[in-house]
From Swiss-Prot:
It comes from Exiguobacterium sibiricum (strain DSM 17290 / CCUG 55495 / CIP 109462 / JCM 13490 / 255-15). Its EC number is 6.1.1.11. The gene is serS. Its main location: cytoplasm. Keywords: Aminoacyl-tRNA synthetase, ATP-binding, Cytoplasm, Ligase, Nucleotide-binding, Protein biosynthesis. GO terms for cellular component: cytoplasm. This is Serine--tRNA ligase. ATP binds at residues 262-264, 349-352. Belongs to the class-II aminoacyl-tRNA synthetase family. Type-1 seryl-tRNA synthetase subfamily. It catalyses: tRNA(Ser) + L-serine + ATP = L-seryl-tRNA(Ser) + AMP + diphosphate + H(+); tRNA(Sec) + L-serine + ATP = L-seryl-tRNA(Sec) + AMP + diphosphate + H(+). It is found in: Cytoplasm. It comes from the Bacteria. GO terms for biological process: selenocysteine biosynthetic process; seryl-tRNA aminoacylation.
Amino acid sequence: MIDIKRLRQDFDAIQEKLAHRGEDLTDMNRFIALDEKRRELIAKTEVLKAERNEATKKIAELKRNKENADEAIAAMRQVGDEVKALDEELREVEATLNLLLLGIPNIPHDSVPIGSTEDDNVVIREVGDKPAFDFEAVPHWDLMEQLKIVDVERAGKVTGSRFVFYRGAGARLERALINFMMDLHQDKNGYTEILPPLMVNRDSMTGTGQLPKFEEDAFKVEDTNYFLVPTAEVPVTNMHRDEILSADQLPIGYAAYSQCFRSEAGSAGRDTRGLIRQHQFNKVELVRFVKPEESYEQLELLTGQAEEVLKLLKLPYQVLSMCTADLGFTAAKKYDIEVWMPSQGVYREISSCSNFEDFQARRAQIRFRREANAKPEFVHTLNGSALAVGRTVAAILENYQQADGSVVIPEVLRPYMGGLEVIQG
């Protein structure tokens, strides 16, 4: 959520920045009218409350002097009724204004490339050598079937499309990657490991920005206040909702493994085969709470930690700075990390690393004090996938495939695979 004071003071500049996102600015124009109405109602209410206070004093004085106070009491009651009506109108206006503010996206940072499509995203760096096969690269979905490590057909029978059964070496590879990533982030990078709930309430989904705007993308548990988590970012960020932290606690870093659930609304017909776009998938997420002045330095750190996973797996990748139109609703700045997929001849997203500045913290009321008696300030929150596990499996299958249809296990994963070096059919 954007600071309402900042929105008033820098309205034109903020409107211009949001226009670069390609956003409909109707809500911005409604904000002006609603904010003026709110301030007008507050002013009227304060005047009437002052009149009521004066009337109360006058009535007390009349009674002390044993004079008739009926007329003054009637007048005070009328003022009281007017105050009550204005308070109710003010509550309605503030509720509408708050809902409107919840629907306005974050303000892009000045360093974000201005663009209108994904073609305007800027490649920052390419890392690693792409494999040079002397055979035609096989798509990972065909490799999975040939190696019998994933069962899509039975998952479709049991549940539906965009679900899989991992089996045998496939299940072990998925589990190995989760353990490898969590060990790396905890043991080397100093994160505290979190295993979060897989359901969260509406306040949590609102705090991190999924609600109210993107409710159709979420899986809601019918007749409850619960949603299945679309990412561990939601429960982990909301761990500190409505809390005031101390400065010496910051930065806080959590690494969380969770299953994630997404409806993939709007993705009909896209990536219908393979592991790229599933309704249920595993992911390791990094979440950081930091001081405002440190958040952009921390974004570089976080992105580097996500990259480290790919470097250790020796998977070629590129890092992009996402343009204004491709930032997502909550981010002030975002890097995407894309891994090379030989069968398609393209890079595919495997991680997003974002700085939300105080956008989520303001929604979730996550603050800190620099000193014991200092005024609380909003923290800055960041998160990044490190990594999406199913997509990492897909990348390993494609980049480590052999001419005979087998797949070599990356060396760093072999201790997690019981020493297995090759998956064979």
